[in-house]
Amino acid sequence: MLGTLLIVSGPSGSGKTTLCRRAEKDGLTAYSISCTTRQPRPGEQDGVDYHFLTPEVFAAQVAAGEFLEHATVHGNSYGTLKSDIIQLLEAGKNVVMDIDVQGAASIRACDDATIRRAYADVYIHVPSAELEARLRGRQTDAEEVIQLRLRNAAAEDARMGEYQFALVSADRESDYSRFTALLTTLGMRTTL
């Protein structure tokens, strides 16, 4: 049976990365190794931490339509190969991807039949007062960074209606319980 590709989006501070990492740690999902053009950091291994590519190889793969999603961040390119995701899905593995709203829209538009059949997405929404408290509680960002993140969150929240599911965040444990319930439910789809 085909696994589920669950795209998880939400503003900074929503807990989306924590949910994805915990599901992987608990063996509920498989890890997809991303590609990057940046240089390996000490201890990183090609094919384990990332697929380290030259900018030329990366650009050729973009031109060939081999990436499910890709972006350039701080001068380096990052992306997820369609073939890697399809291989995991066809092996019956669930894959979760922590992706911003623009990346989610790109994946949603993918025309690959396997990706389309396995696809689901969820938006993690945090009420604005709670989100501000979380961002301030981190005690890692300057005031202007917090304000920027809150403005970005409002813009991202405006796109919540593009998603199949919404998880209104409460606390880590109840969020994780509902997140895993969604993964379980998606695994019962008969359309796969």
Task: Label every model-predicted segment.
Residues 133, 139-141, 155-192:
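NTP-dependent small-molecule kinase module
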Residues 17:
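Walker A/P-loop
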Residues 25-34:
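Post-Walker A helix-loop "phosphate-sensing" segment adjacent to the P-loop in P-loop NTPases
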Residues 5-7:
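Short hydrophobic/aromatic beta-strand immediately N-terminal to the Walker A/P-loop
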Residues 36-95, 101-102:
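ATP-dependent small-molecule kinase phosphotransfer cores
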Residues 9-11:
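P-loop (Walker A) phosphate-binding loop of NTP-binding proteins
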Residues 14:
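ATP-binding Walker
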Residues 94-101, 114-138, 168:
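Conserved phosphate-donor/acceptor-positioning beta-strand/loop module used by diverse small-molecule
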